[in-house]
Amino acid sequence: MSFRSIVRDVRDSFGSLSRRSFEVTLAGLSGLTGHHRGKSQSTVHELCDADLIIQESRWASLPPELLRDVIRRLEASESTWPSRKDVVSCAAVCKAWREMCKEIVLSPEFCGKLTFPLSLKQPGPRDGMIQCFIKRDKSKSTYHLYLCLSTAVLADSGKFLLSAKRHRKTTCTEYVISMDADNISRSSSTYIGKLRSNFLGTKFIIYDTQPSYNGAVIPPVGRSSRRFNSKKVSPKMPSGSYNIAQVTYELNVLGTRGPRRMHCVMHSIPASSVEPGGIVPGQPEQIVPRAFEESFRSTTSFSKSSIMDRSMDFSSSRDFSSARFSDIAGGTINGDEEGQNKERPLVLRNKAPRWHEQLQCWCLNFRGRVTIASVKNFQLIAAPAQPPAGAPTPSQPAPPEQDKIILQFGKVAKDMFTMDYRYPLSAFQAFAICLSSFDTKLACE
């Protein structure tokens, strides 16, 4: 039997298993009356569990060598979507298959592929970029992120990844980010984060539903966590709102010609991640918290700037008053000696464009991925680390790692934009940064 036949048999067994379980449940529930209700219900569960055990043991009993060969061949052959869904199906067979898939299917950082939902919060590939595009619907104030499946972006249906919905408020604008294309709300189980702006649209904070662990030891669920089991939740600690990045656009009060200038402080990514041998520590094991209490666990971070009011009152304006643009440009927000001795967060800045005399416009080399000039277009690179006070300024040019484009975003058609990202950003982080470019910015152009 070929490995394709095995995969087909596995997928077919899912459907028959679901139908049999449903039929057994209906048959048992139809006879539930009086004092026999509890006994009949337990019998139904026993039948379903037995059926599940039989089906799972059938596939779990495969020799590990054969299973490894099947998964490895499938991983190599089904490298693109939509055929890559077969790899996801194999991971859902049973625990043994799932563990084997975790062993063979690498993260996007090393394989350059988006396979599981968890891949959306893992760093992109070190070599090359993952090409995506964003569709905007102005009438619904929604934005949908798709994975490119072909080089023809305008004719590409794409593989859906994430969605966002804009909510305008009196003093700010919020973009709710979800894994569901239609149900885009904070109350949904597919909600994974949000983007929030200040009144002028010059500063944005990216919030994640999970804290950035950063290799820190997570304290056990104690008294401070158990108190959230009650109906009264502290208003100063919203569920699943962890500040992981801040995007700042420089004010253009003089109205001079030129593109926007922006900086991104990635609190969950150390500056050393873009250096040779650098890594992004504390990558999540699941895309949403396992339990409600985990959304409230506090963690140690790189520096004082990476905490940034984890438990804050969203009705106040403290979100954006703790940092000046000049501080962000230098790569740190708190300039004290203690903060400089610790690991600094990664700072991204937009690559400076060049003025084209014939076209009379500012130009960036998007290598054909952007075709329409727009003030929203940008390319982000790593900002060089600022030397400590009193240290001599290095005269040698920046290392090649500093010149690599980490994220690029640009317009290709009406309400259609391309988004290409690479390590150390994840798809979620890149999407949130690009959403900030859509927002109206007073005194920035």
UniProtKB/Swiss-Prot annotation:
Segments passing through the bilayer: none
Limits of the F-box domain: 56-102
Tissue-specificity statement: Ubiquitous.
CDD domains for this protein: F-box_AtTLP-like
Family: Belongs to the TUB family.
UniProt name for this protein: Tubby-like F-box protein 8
Source organism: Oryza sativa subsp. japonica
Lineage of producing organism: Eukaryota, Viridiplantae, Streptophyta, Embryophyta, Tracheophyta
Primary gene name: TULP8
